[in-house]
C-alpha cells in the first residue's frame, strides 16, 4: 500500500543512464533513497526541477523496509521557495546545507523535532534579505542543530586561556599542561570565540560581524567538531565555494 511521504531533498547522484538516486529526509520515515528519472526527457526535466537541494516534495511511495531504493509517484512540490534558487548566496548556502545534512543523516530515522528545525530553517532562509543574516545563516544553523544531535558544547568551566576538547564537548586545560590528542582540540585563541558564538540564533545572527577569516575559522572548527562525532561531516565538496562567497 502506498504512503504519502513528505521529504527534504539532500542529494542526487547518477545511478544509470535512465535513473538518479535522490537522498531525501522524510517526515514520516526518516532518510530514504528515491529512484528518479534521469536524462533529457520532459518527465526527467520536470522531476529534476522538484529535486533541487533543500526542495520539499510530496510523493506516493510503496514503502518496503527491505528495499534500499523506492520509486516515488505523483511527485509534487510541497513548498515553493521564492528566492533560494535565484540568489547566488542563498543557493550556495542551500548546496552546503544539503550536502552536510546528507552526511549527517545518512541512516537517520524519523525525528519530528529535527524535521521541524530543518523545515523552519529553510523557510527562514527563503524569506530573509539582510546580508549579515544570510552570511551567518549556515553557522547559525549548525550551532542550533547541535542541540538536536546531542553535541551542544558545555562551556560552563570556561576561563581565559582554556581550550575546547571536541571529543568530550567540554573545556580543557591547555594541551601543553594537560596533554591529550592535539587534533581533538580547538586552541585557546579560537576557543575564546565560543561563549559568544553559542548564543547565536536566527533572531540575532545579523548582529554578529565576522570578517572573512573569522567566519572561515569558525566554520572549520564547527565542522571538525561535527566530524569528531559524525564521521564524514567535515569533508564537504561545497565548503570552498561557501567560503569564497562569504569571504
Where do the protein language model's features map onto the residues?
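Non-catalytic alpha-helical scaffolds and adjoining flexible linkers that form interface surfaces
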Residues: 1-21, 25-247
Amino acid at each position: 500500500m502506498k504512503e504519502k511521504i513528505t521529504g527534504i531533498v539532500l542529494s542526487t547522484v547518477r545511478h544509470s543512464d535512465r535513473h538518479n538516486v535522490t537522498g531525501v529526509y522524510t517526515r514520516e520515515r526518516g532518510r530514504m533513497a528515491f529512484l528518479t528519472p534521469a536524462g533529457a526527457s520532459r518527465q526527467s526535466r520536470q522531476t529534476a526541477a522538484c529535486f533541487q537541494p533543500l526542495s520539499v516534495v510530496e510523493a506516493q511511495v510503496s514503502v518496503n523496509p527491505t528495499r534500499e531504493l523506492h520509486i516515488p509517484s505523483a511527485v509534487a512540490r510541497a513548498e515553493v521557495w521564492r528566492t533560494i534558487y535565484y540568489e547566488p548566496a542563498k543557493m550556495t548556502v542551500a548546496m552546503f546545507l544539503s550536502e552536510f545534512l546528507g552526511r549527517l543523516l545518512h541512516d537517520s530515522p524519523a525525528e519530528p523535532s529535527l524535521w521541524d528545525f530543518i523545515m523552519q530553517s529553510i523557510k527562514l532562509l527563503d524569506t530573509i534579505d539582510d546580508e549579515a543574516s544570510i552570511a551567518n545563516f549556515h553557522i547559525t544553523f549548525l550551532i542550533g542543530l547541535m542541540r538536536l544531535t546531542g553535541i551542544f558544547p558545555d562551556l560552563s568551566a570556561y576561563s581565559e586561556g582554556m581550550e575546547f576538547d571536541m571529543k568530550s564537548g567540554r573545556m580543557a586545560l591547555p594541551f601543553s599542561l594537560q596533554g591529550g590528542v592535539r587534533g581533538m582540540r580547538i586552541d585557546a585563541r579560537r576557543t575564546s570565540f565560543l561563549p559568544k558564538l553559542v548564543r547565536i540564533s536566527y533572531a540575532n545572527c545579523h548582529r554578529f560581524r565576522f570578517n572573512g577569516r573569522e567566519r572561515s575559522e569558525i566554520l572549520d572548527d564547527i565542522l571538525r567538531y561535527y566530524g569528531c562525532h559524525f564521521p564524514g561531516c567535515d569533508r564537504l565538496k561545497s565548503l570552498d565555494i561557501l567560503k569564497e562567497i562569504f569571504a
